[in-house]
Amino acid sequence: MFRLLSANTQQTLRPAILSKVRSNKANISLPSSSIQVNPPSPAQYNLTCQFTRHNSSASSQKTKSSKVDAFVNKAQRDPVLREALDSEANSKLNYFKEQLSLAFQYRSAKDRDSQRAFVATVDNLFKAFEDESLRSSYSSRDLYSYTQILNFSVYHNRTNRLSSSRNRDSDQYQNENLHDEVLIKSAVLNLSETIISGEFNKILNANILSYLFYSMKQFQLYPEMLNLWENGVNDGETGKLFLNEKILAVILPIAYEQKRFSYEEILHIYELNTKELSTVQHELLCSIGKIAIGSGDYSRGLDSLEALLQLYESKQQSTQHVLASLGELHLNFIGSCKDIKISKHFFDKVVQYDLPYYVCLKVPYIQSLLQNCFELNESLDNIIYFWKSTITHYSNEKNSAGLNSRYSILNNTFFTIFFKIYPTLNAESFNKLREVIALYAEIKPVDEVFLNTIIGNYSWGDKNVLEQLIENYSIYNVKRTPVSYRICLKKTGELPQYTNEDILIKWNDSLQHLDQNGFNYIPIADWAALRDATILSNSGSDRKDFYLAVANQYKDYIQDQRSCIRFVKYWLKKREHLKSFSTLTFGSDADFSNEVDIVVPQFRHLKPNINYQKISSKIIGK
């Protein structure tokens, strides 16, 4: 085992390895002080008399403490009272175990009711965990089951959020996934802090820590992970647990990415903890291989891959888990390797299904591959090859529609690069964009996410081309959500060729879509799109009065008081616009001069929901 010391002179507090201790052969202790301080004996302060106020806080605390001690002593002697206390403790523990059992049952069910029941059960577990007296009765099995459910909750919530066809707009403040995510994250941090406190030292094991670190990694709580690990390593009671191969497999890549250790230091830690092992666990082999690839040491990365293949053939460890590690390391050769020839070799093996093991082509690795290609000045044709092959691979999978987010991430990365390679409009760039759209349409139906991504990244500044892109929603019969209308409206803010009349048409189109889909309010996200298209655009001075006139007509259509307060507080930060904005609160219709005639249509669902002037006047003030 080794010690980690923090250097006071460095802001990053980089730890240094000082030593390794195995089987308690060496110990590190604090240097003894040269000054001996002896506590004074009570006789030195023997006062002849003491004065005590019976109503003093000290007296009160002493009395309360005495009562508590007396109660505890009585409880220890009174079998009836003791039995009652034990019964309550057992009831709490039984309830906790019952909730764990229910959570395991619900997590495997796919129906909506079971998923809701799972969330409610997990919430009960989080609340029960807050009881310190209950935690003291946990067994290792109880804590292990809790961390399993906690880790599954992280994964379950994240999958639901990313696979949903709905976009998590900022105005949807009652979003269930967002609410659950906050609770789960708090529970993860709470467990971490409880472990750091030493409360679970007697029942802690490597499997418990592994699940906790997995959960923290999902939330990208990297500083907290390193803090937990360093505290554990330096704890004489639990130090060896935190140097377990499973734990090192999770923490070493994080420590390297966060520049906590250099590549050489990582290798040293690895060698110190594996030199006496006959076989290294597959997780750690995978991790050291990933770190090697990230540092450019491809030879060692290939050595790790070969070691995993040998481990798979030997069947010394779970073949399923070894194959998962092989797949993970394979992905790192695709996404982390800066030699594109090597990356392409591993990429082709996946998309051509030419492997003895399965590799799930995760989009962050393809995202990284595309970025590496751009940074290394690869041709656009090569970038298109990787992009097109990935889209084809995804569309051929059974759950091709399962995770909409991966198409969004992939397309966003690709078109960000596309418009960097072609920053201006010309015949070549225009034809290339048409070619890309046609390629996508050959693989899978053109969808809203695809067109949203193109329009969102569009940077040529030509109104006619942008309108042609927008027409594709109709050409390809794309089912639209409010998001696409907002993106199109917002994009007009970047092009001065759009008149206020043009912007009003797009605003009305967005409202018509909301009304047709049963909205009875205008979401904050639509107000933000209008704001970015007008008053906060590069043409803001020419569109300011228009924005205020539109806002005046529709200000009571905001969702509710909470949304209204949020809307107003945004403008309080924009001091340069606050005087004009306050006209919405204290002005009348006559104060909004505008050359465009703004007429509110007859809606079926959209309607006034608040008294804007009444609410905002309490915030702004004259």
Curated annotation (Swiss-Prot):
Signal sequence, renumbered to the chain: none
Range of the transit peptide: 1-108
Membrane topology: Peripheral membrane protein
Post-translational events: Phosphorylated. Phosphorylation promotes binding to RNA.
Sorted UniProt keywords: Membrane, Mitochondrion, Mitochondrion inner membrane, Phosphoprotein, Sporulation, Transit peptide
GO (cellular component) term, any one: mitochondrial inner membrane
Superkingdom field: Eukaryota
GO terms classed as biological process: sporulation resulting in formation of a cellular spore
Cellular localisation: Mitochondrion inner membrane
Family: Belongs to the RMD9 family.
Subunit structure: Monomer.
Chain's role: Binds the 3'-UTR of mitochondrial mRNAs. Involved in the processing or stability of mitochondrial mRNAs.
Name of this protein: RNA-binding protein RMD9, mitochondrial
Organism per entry: Debaryomyces hansenii (strain ATCC 36239 / CBS 767 / BCRC 21394 / JCM 1990 / NBRC 0083 / IGC 2968) (Yeast)
